[in-house]
Amino acid sequence: MEILVLNLGSSSIKFKLFDMKENKPLASGLAEKIGEEIGQLKIKSHLHHNEQELKEKLVIKDHASGLLMIRENLTKMGIIKDFNQIDAIGHRVVQGGDKFHAPILVNEKVMQEIGKLSILAPLHNPANLAGIEFVQKAHPHIPQIAVFDTAFHATMPSYAYMYALPYELYEKYQIRRYGFHGTSHHYVAKEAAKFLNTAYEEFNAISLHLGNGSSAAAIQKGKSVDTSMGLTPLEGLIMGTRCGDIDPTVVEYIAQCADKSLEEVMKILNYESGLKGICGDNDARNIEARKEKGDKQAKLAFEMCAYRIKKYIGAYMAVLKKVDAIIFTAGLGENYSALRESVCEGLEDLGIALHKPTNDNPGNGLVDLSQPDAKVKVLLIPTDEELEIALQAKEIAEKLK
């Protein structure tokens, strides 16, 4: 079975094609800067007998044009003979709201609901829907499965996902915590349970997906019971350009003091805050280099980021009571050893103790970073959201045969 995974952003398309016999990628790639003056198309073949890479700068007018280019080059490069040989397509859909708690086979009704949920994810859901609509028109016989970023967190109890606002705002406008990165949190939690030889249904963990966008999740008996992101991905941890948790009154105060519109303030919170807001840079490598040279702003940004993560670990340990593992994943979680060290520092009384030499040089793949006698394992697990989407799509596609 061959499954194509599509992840359409506001101006990009990421894809990965899998052979599900061995869960191995056949090809992967990216179309970016869609709608801009000059875009870029990258496609890499992972076939042993046909290793090649395409990199091309060209105009990519819209998402449909990008998908056409990907389809054309998959056959031109000899990765597949015909696009119609693909058994199913799994789509990453960012916002499933209260409607979608699990992956679902796409039909007209599902497409309408994804469209309606665009109000909660105006940058992402319309792009996700554009990919679904393209395939529906061009290849109506290929089953499409929508996999929602929010679905893993659908198991949160109401006391964790509700905001202390007038209840009618939830009833009328569905204002609540949804959480994101669910596919990633789910994938690494399953990998961790497998690695520790623990039944997933009994597994408790704190998963830290740390990238330019970051979130923490409390996982109890294999299910999400709390997460740091909220109605949108703005809440929670300090991120590359997002502020994370702040006093809501700050929005009004900035608007008044700086004479900004609501839209302008939200732009500041989403794109000009976080690490970038504190030190002018959201590239962790630059921040680390500056910090080592004694740059005070870089040091402050780093310390604020680590401190916020540490606070969430403490909160989630109180929620879970028993924790089998702390999981670090995604770009920063997998590659930023100094951040992992700072986050875990001083948590020995909670059973968390890093083995510094392993943390500094973890190598590749899944690694246990903890001291041998540590009560709580600290694991570095590379995430693979595309594979998790493919696995969930496969489960539904197989039932159709």
UniProtKB/Swiss-Prot annotation:
Substrate binds at R92. Signal peptide: none annotated. It is found in: Cytoplasm. The active site is at D149 (proton donor/acceptor). Mg(2+). Can also accept Mn(2+). The keyword Kinase applies. The keyword Transcription does not apply. The record marks H181, R242 as: Transition state stabilizer. It comes from the Bacteria. Mg(2+) binds at N7, E385. GO terms for biological process: acetate metabolic process; acetyl-CoA biosynthetic process. One of its GO terms (cellular component) is cytoplasm. Its cofactor is Mg(2+); Mn(2+). Keywords: ATP-binding, Cytoplasm, Kinase, Magnesium, Metal-binding, Nucleotide-binding, Transferase. InterPro entries: Ac/propionate_kinase, Aliphatic_acid_kin_short-chain, Aliphatic_acid_kinase_CS, ATPase_NBD. Pathway: Metabolic intermediate biosynthesis; acetyl-CoA biosynthesis; acetyl-CoA from acetate: step 1/2. ATP binds at K14, H209, L210, G211, N212, G213, D283, A284, R285, G331, L332, G333, E334, N335. Its EC number is 2.7.2.1. One of its GO terms (molecular function) is magnesium ion binding. It is an enzyme of class 2 (transferase). Gene3D superfamilies: 3.30.420.40. Catalyzes the formation of acetyl phosphate from acetate and ATP. Can also catalyze the reverse reaction. Belongs to the acetokinase family. Homodimer. This is Acetate kinase. The gene is ackA.
